[in-house]
């Protein structure tokens, strides 16, 4: 019996060490991907063989530094894997929030770190300097500012040369009210930081990091520049206005001007000219209205969701997008696939997506494996497609494609007066009290700032 036991132990010993060799090979494979540099967006990325096993983020979180990581088998298709992980990622973000995005009682208090105000609707905290914005970011991100406060700009602010961390993160979303009052924040360069899968980190980058139950209005962002390169297998959400919009009840963003550039490179990217990732769970209501943007997005990675409005849209609630003019130059280079459109990748399991009176113009490139459509780049197939889409007076154009969307037949789609065009037709039916369409190729929104 001892001989048999010894033989079994020897076999196990050999098996374990042979497995360790495989794990070392795995690490080498990941290093090969991480070390790969793409010198030009016009170059085809060098193909790197995917490892047969990959460590999942959820398992990384639960294992200590002294434990051997657990590995799971790699799905046969990288796109299916990425889409599955996108769903898991949203669940992780929701679970990790240490301060639930629910109403809290805000107690008005004078804070001399602002120019004035006590944080109420009638007397908001007044922001007039870069230092005020930095202070606001630190208060929100550390959880030292209760949800429901009111903030307002009192002057134009030049952020050139100022180090700035996005407002709102995975632990503490921005769930308050921000009124730009028509003032402009210019030359902003938000930085993006990583920790363990977003723990206490700003993995969502923009002027705002993660936005929760909030209202943002009358804000102008000019010459925002986000440059970022990171070798990781984490999801990264980047948008000029906000990296991620992730409320539990309601979020409203209206009357905003967004202009800037994004130049980023990492594994899996959700990048939007306005918002990187929009996640609307059950019973959530989202409203985006009267927004004008002009952006340039240069994106490199393994798998990409890129949009002139939003890189990714998960729509399980009631989502409304109206009177939006989004222009974007999108240069993308992915190793596996890209979804590119006004909304890059969309999932609509049971939501109601309403898009009306919108004009989108996209100048982009296309390579083998990319899915490009002017309005909805591609559907995220993991989710069961039984949500509703309503498109009214929507006109969009993108290079390298000929249609607005390619939505599965299971999704009810109601389309009225829409078209694939880079010039607004005379029959666009846009409200001229909101739009100036003197030049139908370059209309603009009449803001009441």
Residue ranges with predicted function:
Residues 2-10:
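Sec-dependent signal peptide recognition
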Residues 21-23:
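Bacterial signal peptide processing site
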Residues 3-4, 25, 54, 66-67, ...:
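N-terminal cationic leader/targeting segments used for protein routing and processing
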Residues 102-449:
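Surface-exposed repetitive/solenoidal architectures
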Residues 16-19:
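C-terminal motif of bacterial Sec signal peptides marking the signal peptidase cleavage site
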Residues 28-109, 117:
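Ser/Thr/Gly/Pro-rich low-complexity, disordered linker/stalk segments of secreted
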Residues 11-13, 132:
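Alpha-helix capping/helix-boundary segments
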């Amino acid at each position: 019996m001892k001989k048999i036991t010894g033989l079994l132990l020897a076999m196990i010993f050999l098996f374990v060490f042979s497995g360790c060799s495989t794990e070392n090979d795995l690490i080498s494979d990941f290093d090969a991907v991480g070390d790969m540099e793409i010198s030009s967006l016009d170059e085809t990325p060098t193909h790197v063989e995917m490892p047969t096993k990959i460590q999942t983020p959820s398992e990384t979180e639960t294992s200590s530094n002294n434990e051997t990581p657990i590995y799971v088998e790699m799905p046969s298709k990288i796109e299916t894997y990425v889409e599955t992980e996108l769903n898991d990622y949203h669940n992780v973000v929701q679970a990790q929030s240490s301060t639930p995005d629910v109403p809290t009682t805000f107690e008005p208090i004078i804070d001399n770190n602002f120019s004035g105000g006590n944080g109420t609707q009638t007397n908001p905290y007044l922001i007039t300097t870069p230092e005020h914005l930095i202070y606001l970011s630190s208060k929100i991100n550390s959880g030292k500012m209760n949800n429901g406060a009111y903030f307002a700009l009192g002057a134009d602010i030049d952020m050139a040369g100022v180090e700035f961390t996005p407002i709102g993160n995975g632990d503490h979303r921005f769930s308050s009210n921000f009124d730009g009052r028509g003032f402009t924040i210019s030359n902003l360069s938000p930085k993006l930081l990583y920790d363990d899968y977003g723990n206490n980190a700003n993995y969502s980058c923009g002027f705002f990091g993660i936005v929760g139950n909030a209202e943002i209005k009358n804000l102008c962002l000019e010459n925002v520049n986000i440059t970022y390169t990171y070798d990781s297998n984490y999801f990264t959400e980047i948008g000029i206005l906000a990296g991620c919009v992730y409320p539990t009840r309601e979020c409203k963003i209206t009357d905003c001007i967004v202009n800037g550039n994004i130049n980023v490179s990492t594994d899996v990217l959700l990048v939007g000219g306005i918002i990187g990732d929009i996640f609307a769970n059950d019973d959530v209501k989202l409203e985006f209205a009267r927004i004008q943007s002009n952006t340039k997005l240069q994106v490199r990675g393994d798998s990409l969701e890129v949009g002139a409005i939003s890189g990714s849209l998960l729509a399980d609630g009631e989502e409304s997008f109206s009177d939006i003019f989004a222009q974007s130059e999108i240069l993308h280079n992915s190793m596996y696939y890209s979804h590119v459109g006004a909304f890059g990748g969309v999932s609509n399991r049971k939501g109601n997506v309403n898009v009306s009176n919108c004009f989108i113009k996209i100048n982009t490139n296309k390579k083998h494996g990319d899915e490009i459509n002017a309005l909805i780049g591609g559907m995220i197939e993991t989710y069961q497609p039984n949500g509703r889409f309503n498109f009214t007076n929507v006109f969009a154009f993108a290079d390298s494609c000929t249609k607005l969307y390619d939505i599965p037949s299971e999704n009810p789609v109601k389309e009225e007066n829409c078209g694939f065009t880079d010039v607004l037709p005379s029959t666009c039916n846009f409200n001229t009290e909101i739009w100036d369409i003197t030049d139908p190729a370059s209309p603009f929104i009449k803001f009441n700032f």
